């Protein structure tokens, strides 16, 4: 865990899930997109959303140290955790940051749309999960996920071992089976 200042009240946090390695395209979050790296674009776009705090969630592996250094340099908070258990990393972030809801944003999705997310957040809807990923009609990379933290904590126990590498797969499995 690094650079956390949780003195201020946080209703909605944007959790940016990032790692430096990728099987298909290693270090893709550092690739340029215009005048910035992809991770810089994602962090900037997240900051434009109606959230109280933007936090980078990454692994505790040395390969992600450069990513952490970049986020610190840009003045973002960081939560580090197990590279294979994103549910545990998310639960840790919820415990440290203490938001009521969190927005999930993937660091390799520079085209996620802040206006779409803000449209949802402006409604101030009190649901367990708000998403456009079920019965997908939006293009890939334009995902919206807003999750109630109490619901997420309650649902963490239903995750199967193979779902721990994913932030919300266990939730969608239970929704689809309902």
What are these regions (language model features)?
Residues 61-123:
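Short phosphate-binding loop-to-helix
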Residues 112-178:
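Conserved core of the sugar-phosphate nucleotidyltransferase
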Residues 38-54, 69, 73-74:
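A short, N-terminal amphipathic alpha-helix
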Residues 1-25:
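N-terminal nucleotide-binding beta1-loop-alpha1 segment
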Residues 31, 35-38:
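Catalytic alpha-helical scaffold of carbohydrate-active enzymes acting on polysaccharides/glycoconjugates
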Residues 11-16, 39, 53-56:
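Hydrophobic targeting segments
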């Amino acid at each position: 865990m690094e650079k956390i200042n949780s003195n201020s009240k946080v209703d909605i946090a944007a959790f940016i899930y990032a790692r430096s390695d990728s099987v298909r395209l290693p270090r893709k979050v550092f690739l340029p997109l215009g005048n910035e790296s992809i991770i810089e674009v994602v962090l900037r776009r997240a900051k434009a959303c109606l959230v109280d705090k933007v936090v980078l969630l990454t692994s505790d592996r040395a390969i992600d140290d450069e990513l952490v250094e970049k986020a610190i340099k840009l003045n973002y908070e960081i939560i580090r955790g197990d590279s294979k258990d994103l549910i545990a990393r998310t639960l840790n972030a919820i415990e440290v940051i203490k938001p009521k809801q969190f927005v999930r944003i993937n660091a390799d999705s520079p085209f996620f749309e802040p206006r779409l997310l803000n449209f949802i957040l402006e409604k101030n809807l009190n649901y367990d999960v708000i998403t456009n990923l079920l019965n997908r009609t939006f293009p890939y990379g334009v995902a919206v996920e807003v999750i109630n933290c109490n619901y997420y904590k309650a649902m963490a126990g239903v995750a199967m071992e193979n779902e721990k590498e994913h932030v919300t797969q266990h939730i969608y499995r239970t929704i689809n089976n309902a």
